[in-house]
């Protein structure tokens, strides 16, 4: 799992840019990937599964916002993160 600072440095406009949509989506994607691996091992951890579903919903809303705001940025971000087919 990459650190938060590394993700912010890669996707943010500056190192203090923690609130931009791209950074938020990248951070959520990292958390989602980590939690997905956890749930593969711990299949009955329903509490974490609920948290995962909430994170996926939040990322979906942020991606919809980014689509409306900056379509080219959206396409570049999903290609970089590999979250769409």
Curated annotation (Swiss-Prot):
InterPro entries assigned: Ribosomal_uS15, Ribosomal_uS15_bac-type, uS15_NS1_RNA-bd_sf
Could you list this entry's UniProt keywords, alphabetically sorted.
Ribonucleoprotein, Ribosomal protein, RNA-binding, rRNA-binding
Which molecular function GO terms apply here?
A: rRNA binding; structural constituent of ribosome
- Gene Ontology cellular component annotations, sorted alphabetically: cytosolic small ribosomal subunit
UniProt KW Iron keyword: no
Q: Which domain of life is it from?
A: Bacteria
Return the Pfam families for the record.
Answer: Ribosomal_S15
- Name its GO BP terms in alphabetical order: translation
Database matches in CDD domains: Ribosomal_S15p_S13e
Q: Which family does it belong to?
A: Belongs to the universal ribosomal protein uS15 family.
Assembly: Part of the 30S ribosomal subunit. Forms a bridge to the 50S subunit in the 70S ribosome, contacting the 23S rRNA.
- Which HAMAP family does its entry note? Ribosomal_uS15_B
Q: What does this protein do?
A: One of the primary rRNA binding proteins, it binds directly to 16S rRNA where it helps nucleate assembly of the platform of the 30S subunit by binding and bridging several RNA helices of the 16S rRNA. Forms an intersubunit bridge (bridge B4) with the 23S rRNA of the 50S subunit in the ribosome.
Protein name according to UniProt: Small ribosomal subunit protein uS15
Organism, by scientific name, is Fusobacterium nucleatum subsp. nucleatum (strain ATCC 25586 / DSM 15643 / BCRC 10681 / CIP 101130 / JCM 8532 / KCTC 2640 / LMG 13131 / VPI 4355)
């Amino acid at each position: 799992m990459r650190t938060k600072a590394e993700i912010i440095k890669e996707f943010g406009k500056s190192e203090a840019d923690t609130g931009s949509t791209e950074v938020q989506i990248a951070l959520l994607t990292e958390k989602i990937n980590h939690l997905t691996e956890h749930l593969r091992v711990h299949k009955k951890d329903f509490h974490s599964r609920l948290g995962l579903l909430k994170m996926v919903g939040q990322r979906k809303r942020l991606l919809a916002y980014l689509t409306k705001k900056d379509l080219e940025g959206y396409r570049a971000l999903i290609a970089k993160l590999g979250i769409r087919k």
